Amino acid sequence: MVFRKSLLKLAVFALGACVAFSNANAAEGKLESIKSKGQLIVGVKNDVPHYALLDQATGEIKGFEVDVAKLLAKSILGDDKKIKLVAVNAKTRGPLLDNGSVDAVIATFTITPERKRIYNFSEPYYQDAIGLLVLKEKNYKSLADMKGANIGVAQAATTKKAIGEAAKKIGIDVKFSEFPDYPSIKAALDAKRVDAFSVDKSILLGYVDDKSEILPDSFEPQSYGIVTKKDDPAFAKYVDDFVKEHKNEIDALAKKWGL
């Protein structure tokens, strides 16, 4: 009986050790797989001036977040050219990370408590605030002038909630129309199908023209983090350390792109 109990304890211990070993391998697997395949796959946007915008002439995506992604590739693989960029938007970036299509997402992904329960976020690499782009002919001076206005926002973004709460605080009602990408919102604004285009101010800067302006209002500061899967703690730590250790370089890249 004692012999059987000893065997049972040994089996339980062995099983626990196997599970721990398996979990450790899983945690380190992403970083090792990137090194093994010799390529980092990063989800970035392709419609955000300054951050990540498709160059129609070359077919390349260029911008601040692309350069941050290249810096990460250099950190992991020693070569910033060992990278593959996958175009994402606010609606697709999470699912593409979930299904393994990308190793990480660097795509104006705002850090929120709700999102941190689903994904790992690095320390912020950039901070901004939400704003409103409107047509000058509307003569809006602030959100307070926009009672009943229809505001264009991106699908699955934090903007709708932030503007909705701000409007409620000042006692006005606004409506929202959701779009798959930023150019679609700007087109709707130009066609007067929406009264405002709302997203982070530095993004709006890329869409201002002689007929539009950004209102002085700022809403709910946004912090962007590099996003990885929740089950990759070792990779998440590597990415977080990368952001901390390369802060000066990342800040310089932001300035390079006019942010």
Swiss-Prot record:
Q: Name one GO cellular component term.
A: extracellular region
**Highest taxon above the source species:** Bacteria
Q: Which UniProt keywords apply?
A: Signal, Transport
Entry annotated with the keyword Zinc-finger: no
GO BP term (any one): amino acid transport
Major localization listed first in the record, in broad terms:
other
- State where the protein is found: Cell surface
| Signal peptide per UniProt | 1-26
Q: What function does this protein fulfil?
A: Common antigen and a major cell adherence molecule. Most probably involved, with PEB1C, in a binding-protein-dependent transport system for an amino acid. May be involved in binding to intestinal cells.
Question: NCBIfam families per the record?
Answer: PRK11917.1
Say which family it is in. Answer: Belongs to the bacterial solute-binding protein 3 family.
Q: What is the protein's name according to its record? A: Major cell-binding factor
Species:
Campylobacter jejuni subsp. jejuni serotype O:23/36 (strain 81-176)
